[in-house]
């Protein structure tokens, strides 16, 4: 797990190269519905690690997701962490959209009850600004689209009610 690694002993760029290669292998295998934590390693790596050298590898993952009709999870937990943005962030989500990606799910990584649904309203607004019109929930391994309406506008960031 990237959380436990000592980055003085491991080259972050080598780890990311292997990570994105394994993600592509997993998506090619395709026996799951939604890819979560695309940028998970960045939470724990040194802050000066750049993801831009992996643009081609990420594009390959995005294209495979689109071809396999596997959703990309947009996780709101980054808004309540030091990273300060969704995971993946806006630039990668825009690229996914540009490549034709429309199938998304949302999560909040609520490890405590108070975080349930936190920052989902902000995430919905961000996704609408990018052009996304819906997200999916899964029933019986089938995506069920839910409109990204304006129902969250003006809502508290930590509350869906």
Model-predicted segments: where are they?
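Extended substrate/RNA-proximal surfaces in nucleic-acid metabolism proteins
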Residues: 1-68, 151-161
């Amino acid at each position: 797990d990237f959380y436990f690694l000592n980055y003085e002993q491991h080259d972050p760029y080598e780890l990311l190269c292997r990570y994105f290669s394994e993600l592509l292998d997993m998506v090619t295998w395709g026996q799951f519905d939604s890819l979560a934590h695309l940028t998970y390693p960045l939470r724990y790596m040194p802050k000066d690690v750049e993801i831009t050298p992996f643009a081609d590898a990420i594009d390959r993952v995005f294209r495979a997701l689109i071809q396999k009709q596997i959703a990309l999870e947009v996780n709101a937990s980054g808004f309540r962490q030091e990273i300060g943005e969704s995971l993946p962030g806006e630039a990668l989500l825009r690229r996914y959209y540009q490549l034709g990606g429309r199938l998304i799910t949302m999560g909040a990584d609520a490890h405590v009850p108070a975080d349930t649904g936190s920052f989902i309203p902000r995430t919905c607004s961000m996704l609408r600004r990018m052009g996304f019109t819906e997200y999916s929930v899964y029933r019986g391994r089938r995506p069920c689209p839910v409109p990204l309406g304006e129902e969250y506008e003006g809502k508290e960031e930590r509350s869906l009610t």
